[in-house]
């Protein structure tokens, strides 16, 4: 890239007369990038509300002239491909100031995926893998098969029951990806625009032949006109000795779901000095020992991949999150190069393009940190027992479990397919004995949740309501009555004159 660049903001449907004054961009793995563009125009009355949610692209190009201009619709800036580009939609427009000569505007460009932050949903997914669920969310929002893709190196567990509860679709996708160790980043395609790429292995990192880059420490302004890294510092962090996890699955109550990783080298290894204790996790919700091992390994890899972190600055335009770059100076910490995790970009009319970045050794398996909070249900939720078609009696399975319909679930399911089998808490239980009065279709129940996890419901109580009235009216306040669905009765009277 030459010493000067031009910056272009193009719109799919509009061609305003604008000149880019400056821009800043922030992007990282497993989040949506955000590009803020400040531009000037002689037109003080641009219809900004019409620009919202419209397709747009911001480009960096080599500059021969003196001005950076917005030149209209897609592709009109130049027939040559841009040195760098972000595509997406306009999510914010502002008029910052108005003077006699010009008006200053600010536009925010984000990928289409970012729009899912504004869709809050509560719904159920059953018997699907996480990639299947993510694909279903994308399809629900009109994304086609070319707008996202999965690059998988392992098979994924079919999840019996996944609940999205008062959670944005964006957060929901992020949370599931974090739980399964899936990363995502964006590619920019001339035909398809911004494309979300999901991956789970180093073999899926983006490798660009143009990214053997020059390392010129303290070069600063003397390297203007030449792409290089100006600074690269390497931080070594302590890591835990290992990860331990445990859980309980009532379906296979005797199965041990304990799993553990050990990051110790040999007893004499100097690397042991960086180890700090162990992390213990309970409630990751694995169903089998293999699932417990996978979850523990993913948590351990999330720790190990951050043991060595590089921070740097430069002006290499082609660098982007999940791209691997090599330097002309070797670093023993990164024999296979560096994997970019996050970047901050900036440029203006008066200053050339530059960026800062963080990276990790590319030979490591990157796992996103589990930062997206899981929805938590502290109390109870009402639900109704459901049954299969033409079911005369209570619809229960061999473990005495029920199917229920939750009030927030607006999707259509086949009869009795509204939920996973849900256990009923009882006042007395043991091996083939206890107290259990079967619940019939339509009965209102109260659901509680193990550790507040919406994916782990159980019936904690049964309720009467206006459609299913209590069999003890007000004037029977001395009677204790057990009455079954078929009108079998056991009545005990507590009036003092009738009791001993």
Model-assigned labels for residue ranges:
Residues 1-500:
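Amphipathic alpha-helical and helix-coil boundary elements used as assembly
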